[in-house]
Amino acid sequence: MCEDFSFVDNPEFELFISQYSTTDASTLRLKRFDNLKFDKNLAITQIECRRKAKKKLPELAEKIVYPTDVSIEQCSSEILAKFHANLFAGCDAVIDLTCGLGIDSFYIAQQTKSVVSIDAAEIVTSAVKHNMHKLGINNVSVVNDFAESYLDKVKNPFSAAFIDPSRRLTDDRNSRTYAIKDTVPDLNLIIPQIESRCNFIIVKASPMADISQTISDFPGITEVWILSVKNECKELLFKIDFPQTAKQPQIHCIDFVANEAIEFTFKFEDKSISIADGTPHPGQQLFVPNASIMKAGAYDIVADKFGLIRLAANSHLYLSDITTNHEYPGRVFSITNVLSLSKPDIK
């Protein structure tokens, strides 16, 4: 369905949005409105999505149109989309194989000469075309097609590609997959289509994806980014360089806190490190790795770098007698007292 989104510039629409911005969406859908000059349900979708976008997309929240109610759920957040875009800095032409709401394409376009953005849903591409025009972005070409089909028909070379494949299996709406090899579009089909005309591809994946298994499934992976926001792991990024070469990838653990990105990088092969155990006592510091470090399984690597000892076997808590600087990728506490589990101490 090709949708005309010009109604969002209608003063009556803006008045509707303003008047009902805090009203429950279900209540609005049941309420009768006579002689509206726009689609009521689509307008209510805008209200719902704008509410959620205020935190997720603060720059764009009220400047774009949302084609469906899941648009805001599935899109990249502003902070992570800007990070994605930086990975393409200096590229001439980038292809976004899974456009969605177009947030990644929007920010990538600011770092590159041109972007081709593909999506199979016509209502989605209609919305993205409207948004790009309204935002003054003229170096993004939005195409309504399936990624595999487009790549079969168009043989143009690209500097790089970006893909955020769907994690839901197509034959079972109640089944969810976290393995990249099982997602849609099928990366196993995409790679042969682009590897001869592209320098690299960035693949976005669920934070639940198994990093070791993914590297095993796609030996051409050269870099991995584990991205957290305020100590909550949000997503994984995998870079595959072309031509593909099998080597140990670099793992970047990043946590975005306030306006700072706390990063720790290591080689995938470095994971086998032994850390001594110790006993806590007052005056020491207690170290808790952040979510990206935990997802990477790099807690002992970090401990080794910072000269820490482990609280106990199978523990991910660490100790030090020396006050460290603020570069530690996690939380740091001062130990003021150590209590046993005896009844007097517990009381």
Q: What are these language model-derived features?
A:
Residues 1-347:
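SAM-dependent transferase fold signal centered on methyltransferase-like domains
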